[in-house]
């Protein structure tokens, strides 16, 4: 790589090693930033992904690689939504077209994927804690590498981030936390004075001078202490007026910023000064989410995480099978609004995902009954418990994978007290391209054993409506889990009925083999059973459990006693999941003797990324696997 300013046709393709970025001149860095954005936009338009966050940190990524050595220094990208440029510059340029594709590279940093992904992420607010641990490990090992955590302003709303700040500040180890602020709420602070404060009030020379002046003032008899106190008040007043850093300084971090996150050269200079401080430093960087792509700049919320879109306009690509059918998320959102119209006790709570969970319309129609707590799942659950304790009917709208973060609150604050909180778990089961950090693979297992909790897994969008009305009509906690994606085309109701508590339904009566399914696997099982009967004459029973807890003991025992074989289906890990519960119940009723049982569900493993269709095939829960298993159980050939 040249430092002479010579023109390179394609700078990105010339990068052979991450350290090559440090050899580029200003013009080449600008060209590289443009090329990175072009590659990211083109790939995400085809594959979907987190576009706006990654576009906003291109220059920040270049500055990091201009200053630090990724072969030695450790980087932790919080959540990982913003790590696409990092992937392109750290050896995955040629594979980038496979981003989020089955057997391609992950959409998140992943330790198993690259030696430059120093910590795997996917859920928010973990970076500071992980980096603090790495800094301690470095010091214990006697190494001298830098440790850098890059965290967005959204992730800083979580308690875990402040727990990490508290620990890191207390330990006082050399650590750089970069706060990527893309909300632009304090953009007015970007300017000459802010730059002066960033470069000078925190520089090593000024800090040494300040200590010398303090020592001298203390030696002045009579007025020294008073002068020192006045000087400190003046300095703190100046800094707090122009910067928001006092909060971080309270955690014993040296605050630097805010600085322009799109000025590579200046950002690199500030990083160089920050790394020279032998203590925790928080560098506050201002970026524009979606920068370089007008549709994403105009609508960064939509382009935060997006499916395939038209490159020229940013319009979402249309798919034939989704043009007319609503998604489960949309059905949930519209049903919640309908129920809230009739019951003023209904409160909607989300953890920083109003649109993703379907409560955006609720927030606009019922702003006084809507609460976005930020990325604070633990708080969301206990906050809901407080509302429920006072007679309200809170609905916590959350992705299945994120509810894991509030497990103790579910047990201790909600279920122990039998409070009427409704948990609506979107993305139950295989979520698709976001992969193992986002699959809702464990909820039935980690919720099923909690006393007082009712769990419903509706078979379709109409049953989702019924489940919601059932939950809000009850007097205890209820969890409703449903998959990502469109429904099956079930008829929706303006006034859904209430489900009989703990009662499933026999959809098809047969002989010999009974399929006991729940949630997303019910309709595929029914379709396969009907196909087999048409082609072979063999009638298979199909039972929709509906309730994971309590199970319909009466009907399940009857099925076990009237069939030679049972096939149990779920889109959850079979370890401790729905099928485990069915087997426990049947064993307790002593009706498994002589009954052949097969289970199809998710494995005791972290499932990779890919489309839902690909992953259901991979894990053996798709229609083909159900058909193959049923034919084997019936003693038939394909």
From Swiss-Prot:
Catalysed reactions, as listed in the record: D-glyceraldehyde 3-phosphate + pyruvate + H(+) = 1-deoxy-D-xylulose 5-phosphate + CO2
Necessary cofactors: Mg(2+); thiamine diphosphate
Pathway recorded for this protein: Metabolic intermediate biosynthesis; 1-deoxy-D-xylulose 5-phosphate biosynthesis; 1-deoxy-D-xylulose 5-phosphate from D-glyceraldehyde 3-phosphate and pyruvate: step 1/1
Binding site for thiamine diphosphate: 81, 122-124, 154-155, 182, 293, 377
Entries under InterPro entries matching the protein: Dxylulose-5-P_synthase (IPR005477), THDP-binding (IPR029061), Transketo_C/PFOR_II (IPR009014), Transketolase-like_Pyr-bd (IPR005475), Transketolase_BS (IPR020826), Transketolase_C (IPR033248)
CDD domains named in the record: TPP_DXS, TPP_PYR_DXS_TK_like
Transferase is among the record's keywords: yes
HAMAP family: DXP_synth (MF_00315)
Family of the protein in this entry: Belongs to the transketolase family. DXPS subfamily.
Name under which the protein is recorded: 1-deoxy-D-xylulose-5-phosphate synthase
Organism the protein comes from: Oleidesulfovibrio alaskensis (strain ATCC BAA-1058 / DSM 17464 / G20) (Desulfovibrio alaskensis)
């Amino acid at each position: 790589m040249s430092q002479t300013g010579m023109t390179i046709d394609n700078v990105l393709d010339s990068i052979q090693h991450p350290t090559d970025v440090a050899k580029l001149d200003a013009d080449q860095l600008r060209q590289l930033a443009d090329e990175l954005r072009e590659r990211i936009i083109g790939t995400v338009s085809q594959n979907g992904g987190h576009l706006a966050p990654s576009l906003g940190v291109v220059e920040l990524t270049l500055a990091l690689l201009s200053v630090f050595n990724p072969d030695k220094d450790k980087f932790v990208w919080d959540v990982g939504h913003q790590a696409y440029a990092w992937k392109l510059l750290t050896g995955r340029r040629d594979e980038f077209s496979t981003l989020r594709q089955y057997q391609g590279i992950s959409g998140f940093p992943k330790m198993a994927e690259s030696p430059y992904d120093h910590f795997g992420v996917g859920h928010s607010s973990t970076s500071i804690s992980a980096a603090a641990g790495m800094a301690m490990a470095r010091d214990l090992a006697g190494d001298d590498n830098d440790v850098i955590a890059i965290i967005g302003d959204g992730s800083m709303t979580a308690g875990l981030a402040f727990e990490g700040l508290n620990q890191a500040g207390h330990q006082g180890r050399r650590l750089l936390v970069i706060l990527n602020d893309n909300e632009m709420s304090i953009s007015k602070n970007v300017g000459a004075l802010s730059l002066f404060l960033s470069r000078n009030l925190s520089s090593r020379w000024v800090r040494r001078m300040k200590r010398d002046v303090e020592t001298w003032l203390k030696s002045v008899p009579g007025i020294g202490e008073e002068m020192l106190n006045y000087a400190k008040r003046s300095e703190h007043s100046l800094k707090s007026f122009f910067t928001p850093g006092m909060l971080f300084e309270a955690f014993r971090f040296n605050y630097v910023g805010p600085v322009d996150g799109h000025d590579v050269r200046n950002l690199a200079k500030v990083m160089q000064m920050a790394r020279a401080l032998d203590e925790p430093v928080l560098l506050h960087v201002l970026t524009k989410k979606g920068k370089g792509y007008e549709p994403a700049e105009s609508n960064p919320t939509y382009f935060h995480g997006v499916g395939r879109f038209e490159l020229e306009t940013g319009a979402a690509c249309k798919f034939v099978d989704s043009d007319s059918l609503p998604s489960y998320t949309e059905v949930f959102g519209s049903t919640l609004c309908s129920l809230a119209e009739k019951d003023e006790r209904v409160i909607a709570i989300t953890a920083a995902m109003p649109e993703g969970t379907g409560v955006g319309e609720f927030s606009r129609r019922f702003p006084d009954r809507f609460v976005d707590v930020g990325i604070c799942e633990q708080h969301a659950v206990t906050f809901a418990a407080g509302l429920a304790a006072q007679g309200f009917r809170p609905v916590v709208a959350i992705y299945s994978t994120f509810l894991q973060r509030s497990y103790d609150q579910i047990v201790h604050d909600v279920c122990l007290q039998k409070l009427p909180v409704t948990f609506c778990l979107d993305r139950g089961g295989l979520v698709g391209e976001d992969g193992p950090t986002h699959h809702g693979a464990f909820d039935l297992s980690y919720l099923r054993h909690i006393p007082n909790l009712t769990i419903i897994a509706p078979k379709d969008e109409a049953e989702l409506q019924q489940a919601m009305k059932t939950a809000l009509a009850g007097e205890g906690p209820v969890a409703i889990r449903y998959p990502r994606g469109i429904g099956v085309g079930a008829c929706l109701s303006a006034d859904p009925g209430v489900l009989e508590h703990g009662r499933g339904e026999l959809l098809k009566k047969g002989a010999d083999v009974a399929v006991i399914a729940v949630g997303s696997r019910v309709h595929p099982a029914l379709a396969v059973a009907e196909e087999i009967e048409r082609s072979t004459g063999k009638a298979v029973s199909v039972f929709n459990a509906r309730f994971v807890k309590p199970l319909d003991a009466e009907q399940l025992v009857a099925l076990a006693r009237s069939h030679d074989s049972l096939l149990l289906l779920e889109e959850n890990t079979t370890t401790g999941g729905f099928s485990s519960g069915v087997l426990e119940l049947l064993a307790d009723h002593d009706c498994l003797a002589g009954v052949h049982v097969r289970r199809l569900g998710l494995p005791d493993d972290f499932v990779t990324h890919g489309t839902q269709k690909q992953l259901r095939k991979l894990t053996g829960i798709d229609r083909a696997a159900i058909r193959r298993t049923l034919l084997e159980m019936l003693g038939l050939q394909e």
